Curated annotation (Swiss-Prot):
Keywords: Cytoplasm, ER-Golgi transport, Golgi apparatus, GTP-binding, Lipoprotein, Membrane, Methylation, Nucleotide-binding, Prenylation, Protein transport, Transport. A motif (Effector region) lies at residues 38-46. It comes from Arabidopsis thaliana (Mouse-ear cress). GO terms for cellular component: cytosol; endosome; Golgi apparatus; Golgi membrane; membrane; plant-type vacuole; plasma membrane; plasmodesma. GO terms for biological process: exocytosis; plant-type cell wall cellulose biosynthetic process; protein transport; regulation of cell growth. This is Ras-related protein RABH1b. GO terms for molecular function: GTP binding; GTPase activity. CDD domains: Rab6 (cd01861). It is a lipid-anchor. It comes from the Eukaryota.
Length: 208
């Protein structure tokens, strides 16, 4: 196995309104679990995972951002050096879908076209409460020239597919000729303290 230090690193920033499931998607991907107890993300959380695929390996740095308005001023600094922006909405919340336009605009303002943007419709398990059709979301993705996928962090639906889709789109990935393992985990869990304004916040973890 190639040493971790040799891996190319890619920064993924998760953006979207509060309670759309950004943290739940990350938690399902990292640990294959789902927490029904909702706790809002405070500021920015950071985790990393090394993915070993059939012919390549990548180190994904996952930055989980708070959706609350009071933390919006912190987000541009995390977007600026990102490789991927994952814009999440709740398929049962039309407003969260409409708001993805401003999230994408914010990413494009900071990064131009030099970033991969993925639109993610989460909570597909809420079948009876769906307010956004897959056809409408696909049309928006085409219009804005971004990738698109629907997921359910609760059911574990399409979570691995989301990250495989991202990995396949990343430039300059290293090739492993002999590695056949998949989804081996190298976890580093931190809470960012780069912003003094977060020092007064009490972090209760994040589960959504």
């Amino acid at each position: 196995m190639a040493p971790v230090s040799a891996l190319a690193k890619y920064k993924l920033v998760f953006l979207g309104d509060q309670s759309v499931g950004k943290t739940s998607i990350i938690t399902r991907f990292m640990y294959d679990k789902f927490d029904n107890t909702y706790q809002a993300t405070i500021g920015i959380d950071f985790l990393s995972k090394t993915m070993y695929l059939e012919d390549r390996t990548v180190r994904l740095q996952l930055w989980d951002t708070a959706g609350q308005e009071r933390f919006r001023s912190l987000i541009p600094s995390y977007i600026r050096d990102s490789s991927v922006a994952v814009i999440v909405y709740d398929v049962a919340s039309r407003q969260s879908f409409l708001n993805t336009t401003k999230w994408i605009d914010e990413v494009r303002t900071e990064r131009g076209s030099d970033v991969i943007v993925v639109l993610v419709g989460n909570k597909t398990d809420l079948v009876d409460k769906r307010q956004v059709s897959i056809e409408e979301a696909e049309a928006k993705a085409r219009e804005l020239n971004v990738m698109f996928i629907e997921t359910s962090a609760k059911a574990g639906f399409n979570i691995k597919a989301l990250f495989r889709k991202i990995a396949a789109a990343l430039p300059g990935m290293e090739t492993l000729s002999s590695t056949k393992q998949e989804d081996m985990v190298d976890v580093n869990l931190k809470s960012s303290n780069a912003n003094a304004s977060l020092a007064q916040q009490q972090s209760g973890g994040c589960s959504c």
